[in-house]
Amino acid sequence: MPEHLNARVEACYRQAEHFFQRSFPRPTVSFRLRGQKAGVAHLDENLLRFNPQLYRENREHFLEQTVAHEVAHLIAHQLFGPRIRPHGEEWQLIMRGIYGLPPDRCHTYAVKRRATTRYLYRCHCPEHNEFPFSPQRHTLVAKGRRYYCRRCKATLVFTGEVLRE
């Protein structure tokens, strides 16, 4: 999997070097990115991080657009310094002029939301007496924190029911 992506990073750098007639230090490439972002360029560390899940699901477009997008951030930073806007004129020049790609800020990949877990708590109110707690809040209760109903002022009690969405 990383061979194609690393080859694309190298190709983007060679295009930039040919265009600007200078060399650029190669970044460290990581596949340790999760969530909604397809890629992130860490400018000061000269590091590119990519989302392996989105890469697997959108390989062709990812290699073409996302890799060039992130490399363009590093090239723009190395050429123009830290005071430029992330998707400003300099970055757009690199995307259009060197890579011949649209300077799109965001991807349109379908991102699967991860399953959420909720722990059901109750109070003594006749209506609206169920409170779904996040795993973090449930852990705090297990460590002794108490939560109270705003209506009846009773301590919320775990029902033992776990909801997975």
Curated annotation (Swiss-Prot):
PROSITE patterns: ZINC_PROTEASE. GO terms for molecular function: zinc ion binding. Binds 1 zinc ion. Residues 10-158 form the SprT-like domain. It comes from the Bacteria. InterPro entries: SprT-like_domain, SprT_Zn_ribbon, Uncharacterised_SprT. Zn(2+) binds at H69, H73. The gene is sprT. One of its GO terms (cellular component) is cytoplasm. Its cofactor is Zn(2+). It is found in: Cytoplasm. Keywords: Cytoplasm, Metal-binding, Zinc. This is Protein SprT. GO terms for biological process: response to stress. It comes from Pseudomonas aeruginosa (strain UCBPP-PA14).
